[in-house]
Amino acid sequence: MSSLTQLVADELAQPVDPRVRDMAEALAAKYPSASQAVLFYGSCLRESQLEGLMLDFYLIVSSYEAAYGKGWLARANRLIPPNVFPFEHQGLMAKYAVLSEADFHRLNGPETRNVSVWARFSQPARLVWSADKDAMTKAIEAVSRAAPTLLAAAGSIDGEAPLDWWRRAFALTYSVELRAERKSRSSSVVDAGPARYERFSIPAMAAIPVGAKAGGWARRRVEGKLLSVARLAKAAFTYSGGIDYLAWKI
């Protein structure tokens, strides 16, 4: 196991609020024949008062057919991943995104220009539930691809401090998507845990593939905003209260 993979595994294994664990288990139980892993991420990781907040999960499934059958939801999830749904458990509210194991691996890596998954999983997350050891290993391996992909896409600048590289990289990803957050949000991601990003810097840089190409951000912005619109339009049908969700996201 590489030093980066070990860092990711250790971080994903950190404990969470028992209510988050219970929610993840209940979410996995909704898809008993498909669920492989449930990851918890986002700003709520740093919160102890969860009431009134919207928690964020990724549900990783073996396949979309195993999750939904052969209907339109499986086709929509494959065509424009992920599908996003609301979830409520024991008074807590969440939204969860569904990806297959194959898509989760692919979307965390440099083979996709879209930033949405690898930008999120370059940040702290928790692997709250997994079906078995194999599912856990696959989730760790997928998440381990995210940070090198982020830094490689941003490209290095001579003399730039590691934390500034992270800040610049996140700023680039925030410019790609339709987001309601303030522009300063990209810097606050790093500033909320600078020691974490310092610790990840050298292993993540070492894991950047040889010959990795930086740049292409003008194209990413055009494609990213179009994809964001397509995902939001799809969410109007998959997400209960879809119009309210659209307004909140925009």
Regions from the language model: what does each represent?
Residues 1-30, 34, 39, 45-51, ...:
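Catalytic core of pol beta-like nucleotidyltransferases
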Residues 58-60:
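Short hydrophobic/aromatic beta-strand micro-patches
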